[in-house]
Swiss-Prot record:
Keyword line: Ribonucleoprotein
Domain Sm: 4-72
HAMAP family hit by this protein: Lsm_RuxX
NCBIfam families the record matches: PRK00737.1 (NF001963)
Record's protein name: Putative snRNP Sm-like protein
Gene Ontology annotations for the cellular component aspect, listed alphabetically: ribonucleoprotein complex
A single GO molecular function term of this UniProt record: RNA binding
Entry keyword Ribonucleoprotein: yes
Family listed: Belongs to the snRNP Sm proteins family.
This protein's record includes keyword Ribonucleoprotein: yes
PANTHER family: SMALL NUCLEAR RIBONUCLEOPROTEIN (PTHR10553), U6 SNRNA-ASSOCIATED SM-LIKE PROTEIN LSM7 (PTHR10553:SF5)
Database matches in InterPro entries: Lsm7/SmG-like (IPR044641), LSM_dom_sf (IPR010920), Sm (IPR047575), Sm_dom_euk/arc (IPR001163), snRNP_Sm-like_arc (IPR022901)
Amino acid sequence: MANRPLDILNNALDTPVIVRLKGAREFRGELKGYDIHMNLVLDNAEELREGEVVSKFGSVVIRGDNVVYVSP
């Protein structure tokens, strides 16, 4: 049986991920948690623009309805 999306997120816990949001925003950070709505918690988060870091954050919570994809 194929992995379900939440199974893939579970396997990506405590590893670096890139999260693409609506409006072409991207964040990179260590995935610390998620829920069934795909709300995400990232540590050491950075906002990327055209592959370059434009802002650094500590921990961030990303609302799941803004997520386009999560790349482990």
